[in-house]
Structures are given as structure tokens and as C-alpha cells.
From Swiss-Prot:
Catalytic activity: an acyl phosphate + sn-glycerol 3-phosphate = a 1-acyl-sn-glycero-3-phosphate + phosphate
Catalytic activity, EC: 2.3.1.275
Segments traversing the membrane: 3-23, 53-73, 82-102, 112-132, 142-162, 166-186
InterPro entries (UniProt xref): G3P_acylTferase_PlsY
Pathway the protein acts in: Lipid metabolism; phospholipid metabolism
Assembly description: Probably interacts with PlsX.
One Gene Ontology cellular component: plasma membrane
Phylogenetic placement of the source organism: Bacteria, Pseudomonadati, Spirochaetota, Spirochaetia, Leptospirales
Record's keyword terms, sorted: Cell inner membrane, Cell membrane, Lipid biosynthesis, Lipid metabolism, Membrane, Phospholipid biosynthesis, Phospholipid metabolism, Transferase, Transmembrane, Transmembrane helix
Family, as annotated: Belongs to the PlsY family.
Species annotation: Leptospira borgpetersenii serovar Hardjo-bovis (strain JB197)
The protein, known as: Glycerol-3-phosphate acyltransferase
Membrane topology annotation: Multi-pass membrane protein
Length: 218
């Protein structure tokens, strides 16, 4: 029963739409109707300021950290496979939140939280790829896709070459599974990139004016 309860709580905690609620409370807006229409930290930061976007980022990462960390403490007999299951459920909760009609965010920050507990070195490598990609391409979506693709590779190479540990196929397989999910949640971003209509990581002047006009019409 403890396994089922913890699994349920992992999904529910992951489904808490912090970005949506914070934008609604402090920005007086439905964030799903502005910018990229995503509930994540980037869209919140771009739409109402990073003093709100950064807390959303921290909270979304925490949604991945706590289910994995606490399941390892309170249900140690479940081992890494159960920790991963709780992590996957948290990510799925973020992507398919019952609070938002089973729609949600991309799952990138929550995925980061999951693997920060289990494989921090791999996460730091993926964060580095994310930052370099954004620096070069100027799109958060491309950074997220590249980071999710490289996370399993960084994990495998860091385990073998740096930590001299055996690669856990539970962890590697879960990384691949979630990475595929993250890429699928970025389908619209990919289409916008191909159409040259994707929003930049930092607003330019035209986007700023358009955003102000949208808010003024509300």
C-alpha cells in the first residue's frame, strides 16, 4: 500500500501547476494564452518577469527532487527502480496535470530535479549543454531538446570514465524514455523554429510591444 500511496503522491505533487498559478496570482493572466502558451518558468519569466519566473523554475525542479529523494528514504526496499518510477510519475504529472484538464508543461525542469538526486554529474553536463546551446541558438526550446538528448550520453560516459561505475540500465532506460517524452512535448516549438516564428530566450523589442498590447487588451 505504501508503494501505491507514494506513487500517487508523486503524480499529484508533479501535477501542481506552479507557473499557471503564479502567473494568475501575480500577473493576472492565464499564462497558457501568452507567449509560447507554456506554463513553465521560461514563459512566465518572459511574460511577467524573472522575479516570478525563477521561483517557478525552482518549484518545478523541486517537484522532481522530492518524490525521488523521499521515496528513497521512506521506501528503501523499492530501490532505484521505485525512485525512478516516482520520478517518471512526477514528470508525467507535470505534463498532464489534472488541475489543468490533463494538460501541462514540457517537463524539462522536473526531469532535472529527478536526476539531480540520482545522477548529479550527468545533470550538470546536460545543464552545460543547455546553456551553450541557448548562447549559440538563442532558443530555450533548442537548449531543452539538446540537453534531453545528451543527458543519457553524459550519464553513460561519466559513469564509465569519471566515476568508474557500472551503468545502471534502469537509469539509462528511464532517461531515454523521458527524453523522448520531452522531445514530443516540444513538437510545436520545432514547427515554430522551422517556420522562424519561435520566441527567443530573451524578448526583443517587437515581442515586448506585442506582449504589452495583448495585456492592455485584456
Amino acid at each position: 500500500m505504501n508503494f501505491a500511496i507514494f506513487a500517487f503522491l508523486s503524480f499529484i505533487s508533479g501535477s501542481i501547476p506552479f507557473g499557471y498559478w503564479i502567473a494568475l496570482r501575480f500577473g493576472k493572466m492565464d499564462i497558457r494564452k501568452f507567449g509560447s502558451k507554456n506554463i513553465g518558468a521560461t514563459n512566465v519569466g518572459r511574460s511577467i518577469g524573472w522575479k516570478f519566473g525563477f521561483p517557478v523554475l525552482v518549484l518545478d525542479v523541486a517537484k522532481g527532487i522530492f518524490p525521488v529523494y523521499l521515496s528513497g528514504i521512506y521506501i528503501p526496499e523499492g530501490g532505484v527502480p521505485f525512485q525512478l518510477a516516482c520520478g517518471v510519475l512526477a514528470v508525467l504529472g507535470h505534463m498532464f496535470s489534472p488541475f489543468l484538464g490533463f494538460k501541462g508543461g514540457k517537463g524539462v525542469a522536473t526531469t532535472l530535479g529527478v536526476f539531480l538526486v540520482l545522477t548529479p554529474i550527468a545533470c550538470f553536463g546536460a545543464i552545460f549543454v543547455f546553456l551553450v546551446t541557448i548562447k549559440y541558438f538563442k532558443f530555450v526550446s533548442i537548449g531543452s531538446i539538446f540537453a534531453s538528448l545528451t543527458l543519457p550520453l553524459v550519464y553513460a560516459f561519466s559513469s564509465i570514465l569519471l566515476l568508474h561505475e557500472e551503468v545502471s540500465y534502469w537509469i539509462l532506460g528511464t532517461m531515454v524514455f523521458i527524453s523522448i517524452g520531452i522531445i514530443l512535448t516540444h513538437r510545436e516549438n520545432i514547427f515554430r523554429i522551422l517556420n522562424r516564428s519561435e520566441l527567443f530566450a530573451v524578448k526583443n523589442e517587437d515581442e515586448e510591444r506585442n506582449g504589452d498590447s495583448e495585456r492592455n487588451r485584456r
